[in-house]
Every structure is written in C-alpha cells, then in structure tokens.
C-alpha cells in the first residue's frame, strides 16, 4: 500500500456483511479483535495500522499504479513471498466475541447486519471453505433484509444531496412579480 492508504470493510453501513472472504481473511491476517472492530463498525484503518496488524505486507512511496505494476512484476518473478490466508489458523477469541456481541446488542440492537458480522467473523475459526460457505449464507440473509434496501437508499440519497446540477446556471432577471392573496402572508411578500 501507499502511505495514504486506508483499509476498511464498510459493508455494514449498507446493511450487509463483507463478501468474497472479507470476514474470513481479515481475522486470519489481523486477528479476530481487529476484524470484529473493523467489520462491525465499518471503520477504516490507516496504512501504518494495517501494516502493524498484518493486513497489508508493506507500504511503498510513489504513484499507486506504478507501485502495483512493480509489485505484480516482483510477484511474477518470485521475489515476493505470498501468504495463503486460507491456511492461516484463527484462534477463537471468546472474550472478543462476547464483547462484540454485547456491544452490538447495546449499540445496534435494531440493526440486522452488525450481528451477522460477528457471526461471520466467528466462522473464521473453521477451515476456510466452511467459513466462506458460512459467510455466503449470512450475506444472503442480509441481502434479503429490508434494512439493506433502506440503508442503500440512504447511502445514495446522502450523496445526491451534495450534487447541485444547476450550480453553474445563470439566474434570470426578474422583471415582474405577482402576489396572489392579500392576507398576512400575501401582504408580507408584497412589502418585501
């Protein structure tokens, strides 16, 4: 990664859990407690924290595209040692699991996906194929939840508010104005 890199699994904010092995690889690389923190909160960690935790292998300075190409060349030439995350065992961290189940019960009692995130991370104590199947089943449950649809709608609505399509439009000159009604509001508008 680059120094400005931020690593995260923010899917919980959309009412789902990370897919494609995110809930299985994060605990294998960074430990169960960090995975629970990141996955249940959607928190992104800075590059140095990700490196210290083992989520990434190194931090390189430079242009991201050039860094990626150089890393790909080094991997093809066998100069980078790859980690097979599926072969890394995860010890069950019962205190962390209990803490996060309790935390989700207090902070997210009415939300569906944070609880499923804890269940999915717990599945990382199984062999990778079983953990991935468990993740997939939990992902499907979240996908079918009406909360997911609402959170996705809210996500896009928040972004749409920041867009002003008429931002560069030139205002037209007002030449005439008419006020209908002579009550309190109408007379107030007319005098303004």
Per-range role (PLM):
Residues 140, 146-147:
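Terminal amphipathic alpha-helical/low-complexity segments used for targeting or macromolecular assembly
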């Amino acid at each position: 990664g680059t120094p400005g890199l931020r690593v995260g699994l923010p899917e919980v904010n959309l009412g789902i859990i990370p897919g494609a092995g995110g809930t299985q690889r994060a605990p294998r690389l960074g430990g169960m407690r960090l995975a629970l923190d990141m996955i249940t909160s959607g928190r992104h960690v800075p590059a140095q924290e990700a490196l210290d935790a083992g989520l990434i292998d190194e931090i390189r300075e430079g242009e991201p595209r050039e860094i990626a190409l150089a890393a790909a060349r080094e991997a093809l030439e066998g100069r980078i040692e790859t980690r097979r995350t599926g072969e890394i065992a995860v010890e069950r961290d019962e205190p962390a699991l209990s803490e996060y189940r309790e935390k989700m019960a207090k902070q997210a009692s009415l939300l569906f996906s944070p609880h499923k995130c804890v269940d999915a991370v717990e599945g990382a104590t199984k062999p990778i194929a079983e953990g991935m199947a468990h993740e997939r089943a939990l992902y499907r449950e979240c996908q079918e939840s009406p909360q997911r649809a609402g959170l996705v709608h809210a996500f896009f609505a928040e972004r749409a508010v920041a867009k002003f399509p008429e931002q560069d439009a030139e205002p037209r000159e007002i030449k005439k104005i008419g006020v209908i009604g002579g009550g309190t509001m109408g007379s107030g508008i007319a005098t303004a």
